[in-house]
Amino acid sequence: MHFSGVAFILISMVLIGSIFETTVEAGEGPKSDCKPDLCEAACKDLGKPMDFCKDGTCKCKD
């Protein structure tokens, strides 16, 4: 049971990361208040530091 919880969290992180990766690369997507903690986590999943997070856009440093 503990393992399934860990697996669920990992799968969720991958799905969230892929959504943010698409938003970061395409520069479009749902416009909403950018959440710095989610943006930073998405950039960390890509192996990059967060550059900025404003106007619903998450940008990672290259």
From Swiss-Prot:
Residues 1-26 form the signal peptide. Expressed by the venom gland. GO terms for molecular function: potassium channel regulator activity; toxin activity. GO terms for cellular component: extracellular region. It is found in: Secreted. It comes from the Eukaryota. Its main location: secreted. Disulfide bonds join 34-53, 39-58, 43-60. Transmembrane segments: none annotated. Keywords: Disulfide bond, Ion channel impairing toxin, Neurotoxin, Potassium channel impairing toxin, Secreted, Signal, Toxin, Voltage-gated potassium channel impairing toxin. Negative results: does not block or only poorly Shaker B and Kv1.3/KCNA3 potassium channels. Belongs to the short scorpion toxin superfamily. Potassium channel inhibitor family. Alpha-KTx 18 subfamily. Has the structural arrangement of an alpha-helix connected to a beta-sheet by disulfide bonds (CSalpha/beta). Probable voltage-gated potassium channel inhibitor. This is Potassium channel toxin alpha-KTx 18.3. It comes from Tityus discrepans. The lineage of its organism: Eukaryota, Metazoa, Ecdysozoa, Arthropoda, Chelicerata.
